Amino acid sequence: MDSILVVNAGSSSVKFQVFSAEGEGKLLRQIKGQVDGIGSRPRLRASGADNEPLADRAYPIESVSDVPAAMGVAGGWLRDELRISPMAVGHRVVHGGPDYDRPVLIDHGVVARLERFVALAPLHQPNNLDPIRSLLANFPALPQVACFDTAFHRTHDAVADYYAIPYQFYVEGVRRYGFHGLSYEYVAKTLPHVAPEIAKGRVIVAHLGSGASMCALKGGRSIESTMGFTALDGLPMGTRPGQIDPGVVLYLVSEKGMSPAKAQDFLYRDCGLKGLSGVSNDMRELEASEDPKAKLAVDYFVYRVGLNAGMLAAALQGLDAFVFTAGIGENSMRIRARIADQLAWLGVTLDPTQNSRHARLISGSDSRIPVYVIPTDEELMIAQHTLSLLLDRSSSSVRHERVS
């Protein structure tokens, strides 16, 4: 079976999926799994194409102490027990910086460039690069493809991505990038099959999960996003604050004595829903909690989504549809309903029955614009990009080393 392995590596887990290439560019998901609890309680879990369990096993802490070790566990299980040797590996890489506006085949030069952006995505980029380096070292001829969360937003008008600071900083790469691009790209490619006319128009997509952002699409292309230079900006998230006055950061350093490293860790790990509520970074727990600060965190999240929707509608000069996606957007009917209330000025209403069913179309019959729920599939986008790059180079005589 010709297959593509998709890897999404984080600080405490490595998520992976295997897709079979069926010809004519068609891909079928065969395996979905992850190694989580890295460095604490390592565990491999995996399921097959029909969600049948394939693995659920624990490992000693010392055997899975970092991301490369977790990759070794996943790769060894795929190779030794399922006899799967992928013809290529596609990776989610959060930050492509100014260098990359599309997926790219990875070599040591690409890795060196991507290492320059670690400071711009310290929560993600180092972990994204770890399995890439490991595979380059152990299987140097195995094609690897980097797919960037920033690339989809490179269609913005230039003026949208400046900061009002000296121009030289823009030249150096200090600019607005936007993130969750693989998710938005999937929604943009799915919309023509859901509502062809709407897909040609002005659409706001809300990617609401532990990481959260929103994107303005015009004709399926990103023209504006709530995130900027880093994935700290925009909406409040599980542990990240979203939009914040830079003066707050100066205050943390000058008045609270935080070092730059401490301030960075604080902003990425101790803020957002977790910081505001003091309860949890998980929206499900906050919705179920009776703690007043949990309610405050939910209220603030909903308010900021509504506020940013107004900004994006202005960028689009109108609105033809609104789309929810990602964990909260796909699964929380209460959050969707509350956000719809925030959008009443746009003529948005929801059908309570369809919303409770998590239907594809959840807007009411009297809504001025349709409201959709479209489950995202970033892994499929990565697999498609990886296959496309392989096909592009198929005329060459490069020998592909299989993992064996």
Swiss-Prot record:
Mg(2+) binds at N8, E378. Its EC number is 2.7.2.1. Pfam families: Acetate_kinase. PROSITE patterns: ACETATE_KINASE_1, ACETATE_KINASE_2. ATP binds at K15, H207, L208, G209, S210, G211, D282, M283, R284, G327, I328, G329, E330, N331. HAMAP family: Acetate_kinase (MF_00020). This is Acetate kinase. The gene is ackA.
